[in-house]
Structures are given as structure tokens and as C-alpha cells.
Amino acid sequence: MDANASQIQGDCDDRFLAVKDEFRRNFQERSELGAAIAIHLDGEPVVDLWGGVAEPSTGRPWDQDSIVRVFSIAKAMTAICMHVLIDRGLIDLDAPVAQYWPEFATNGKSDITVATVMSHQAGLPVWQAELPKDGLLDWDAAIRALAREKPIWEPGTCHGYHGTTIGFLEGELIRLVTGKTVGSFLREEVAGPLQADAWIGLPESEEPRVAEVSIVEADPNSAMFAKLMAEPNWVGWKLIHNTGGTNDPANINTRAYRAAENPSVGGVASARGLARLFSPFSRDGAVDGLRLVRPTALPAMRHPRSASDCDLMLRLPTTFSLGFAKSWGARKSGPGNHVIIGEQAFGAPGRGGSIGFADGEAKISFGYVMNRHGGGVGLNDRGQSLVDAAYRALGYTSSDPGCWVR
């Protein structure tokens, strides 16, 4: 038995013991290093497990307070903030972005609506102009550059994963409407009141809790991606290569990149924090007497808004609601390139295989974080096995083309 598997700690309701078994197997058979999983059912914790090593260089163990970079789960954090403001009537989904951000109207963008941005249909999936080193650490410069961009496709006609840009597009709307940065709004009006450990822009006071991201595995579809990356004219090339160093492994564990408010890929959280953050949206928009949105806000968060068997950026099946990932494709997409969650669920995967989501039909909110990255752009077998076990425990079955249904 892997030593880390024998050190799993925390609590697990008897109904979800299969989740605990899979969590243990992740250490025994799937090369987990350090990780945590949390599940809330109807707002109450039913799984809260952790184990392994948080800092390989020192041997520091993963404990109940460990937090780690969760990268693109920041997109879901930002989308939650957007829906809070939409529900308050401060942002109109059908309004042009330029109504709030006049500088955005240049180069054929005057008619792009908030909903078009949130559904990855704006045609602005990357910065086409070259970003300088550490370019996404400078909010104002990144926003000015984004406002000058011209859509790659006609907005609203198709979709492609806005992997690096969507958080900045939404984050600037949040700043213009509230006067607060997205990280401040998240802490002051969402995660803070929920007492959820989730940040976009990590305070220095939280640094001692951070787990070190380690051991990036080879992409299971590396031959495919190597071919795509060798094509500079492919639009997705800049998703990887024009990020100002954001995707550079040398920057993953730096204080500067954890501190930066990057609402596309800059999330930091614990599994417990993610389960708590999504908990209101697994119910009616409220938990423990704290209401974030009215029940009428939930359909826009849940219902698919854009879907394709071949996302223009990822060249894989993807589906999005307004701001959130839904189930992505079938398991035949290959390890690391699918996200199989409930038909009614919404959330986001994070680089390396973490995930946070809510499912109002199943009444669960879910957070899984780890520090050993897997390949692909979705869930690898570690995270997916935990999701699968949770849904089976609730009596769900897996469907074709790839989601869990009752």
C-alpha cells in the first residue's frame, strides 16, 4: 500500500464510502500525491477527506487547511460573481458589453452581448496581439489590449473555449459595475460571507497553507496536441503560447502568480471551500440563511447555451451554460479530455484535473483539488473516479453521450 493511502483523514458519510474507496485507490493505483475531496448534500457536508503530501520538497503533509492553485475553476468563481450581479439587476445578459465598457466597442465588437461573452461565443478566445512577459499580471494593460482585439469569428455564430480571456472580460464588467476588482468582490460578497476558502488573488497571509503543484504528467493525447501546437496558424496555438508566461511551469508555484487577480486561470481553493462555494447553487440559491441569488437565477446557470462536437479552440466536444462548463463529451474522448458530471450540473474543471460544481437535481456540491497534475484539458481518472462514485451513491447512471442521469 502507498504510504499516502494509509494517511487519509477526515469524515465520510456511510452512503459515500465508495467515494472514500476511490480516493484511497487514487493514492494506491493512480499516483496521487496530495489531494482533498469534499461533497455537500443539500448544504450539509457528507464527504471531507484529505491525504498525501502538500510539499514534496519538504515532505509537509496535506492537512485539513491545505489550499492549492485550481487554475480554471476561477472561471466558475467569476461566473458566480456575474450571476449575483445579474440577479441584482446590475448587469443585463442581453445588453451589449459596450454599454458598460465603451472602449470595448472597437473592431466590430459593439453588438457583442454579455450572454455572448459568457457562453464562449464572442470570438475573443485569445489575445491575438503578443503579450509581454508577465503581461497578465498587469490588469489595466491586459484589459486595454483586450478592448483593441478583433473577433476571430462572427460573434454568436459558434463557440470556442475562451480559456485565457473570459475571466478578464467578465472581471472588467464586475469592476466597472461595482468599483471592485473581481477578487475583492468574490471575497467580500460571495466566498467571504460563505466562509469558503476560495480566492482569485491569494492574500499573503494564506501562503503558509499553500500546497506545491508538482509532477506534471505527459498529456495522454500528446501526439494530437503536439501536432496542433506545431501549427501557428491554428487559433488554439495562442491559447497555449500567448499568455505572457501564465502557462510557464516555472511560474506555477510563484507568489506573484498566486497573488495576481487572474479570473481565467488564477483560482486558489480548498476542496472544502469549493463545495461550500457551490453549495447555494445546489439548492435554491441560498444556504444556511445566506441567499446569493433568487431561484429564478438558476436556470441561466444550469441550462446549456452553447455546445459543439468540435470546440473551435480545444477540438473536443464541449458544452457551456452562461459562464460554466457542463458535461464535456463522452468518455471516448480519451483520458483527461472529458468532464462527465450530472445532466443538470454546472461548474468548471481546473488545469491538471481539479473540479468544482453544483448539481441542483442531485442536491450536491463538489470540490476536488490535488497537486499532481494529469494531462488533458478535463478530468483525469483520479477526479472522474470520485465524481462517478458520488453519482452512483445517489442512484444515478451514466448515459450516452456522457453525463450522469437519474
Segments and roles (model prediction):
Residues 17, 23-24, 43, 67-95, ...:
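Active-site SXXK
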